[in-house]
């Protein structure tokens, strides 16, 4: 009705944003980050090749691409930032909105139609916009597209393989950047083997961060051979005696624990019940597809951020790019799950999952630990994990 009245000249429609303008948050890069950020910018001027940014978890890769985004926004360019899961949008949206107030839009399949319409209005009215999205945001009708960021680029969630059209968002991002003559940066602490290979062949410019932000220590990794009976404690067939002891120490220090069990369904429920018996005074929660469906992504993660949860047990969802500030211990219950699957990528995926998950610990403090339970401690993947040697492992796979 309003649109019709406007056509008749009886009223005028305008958009009004009631939100008060906020002050832009000031951030600072370390010397290592500044060097890499400046190198990426200068290399783009020279050859405009896609950039692959790697480095240990917690090294500040996000701050580097925020610095890159800033240079594009200041030149009235728009930016797309892709994340693999809806659950990751909330944290990244807050970070980007602090740095670029009023310019950030979230976009995903669970949004209300009204929110999407409001987002499209902002896209239309603003010359420079930042979209934080899952893979669907890659098709947003942005003008002046200057940069595409694919965070956690190794994630299989970027692949649409359940319905037509089938595509990999990373590859679509590569093509859109070519069509729009924009820049592309792929970001991951454990890149996909394809991207690593492309960097080896000089198709991508490769950059890596070797130190954690603020020089926090990486977690000390302890590998437990679960073939040894002495690693077990009576009443616990899945959790080693060492892991139980370490959990108790961390709980007494009022810190939090993440546990990874990459198995869906009853196995996770069984482990959850074991944890309840072992640590009856602790608040324990699950983070898997069933619990997310019941409580929602944001409810579980927000409760953990607010320290309402002491131990969070999850499937592979728990390993993906979330910045937990109070986690001092992570435990991989069975690092071998998935190794025997008929998939030539099985070992690569296990390495990436464990590498990402271990990086959730000690992001804002020293003294963190990671305990990896395995029946194959001599496998190349386990030995590479213990030494944080990603290049050696990828060269072994290639």
Regions found by a protein language model. Give the residues of each.
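Interdomain "pre-motor" coupling segment immediately N-terminal to P-loop NTPase/helicase cores
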Residues: 1-20
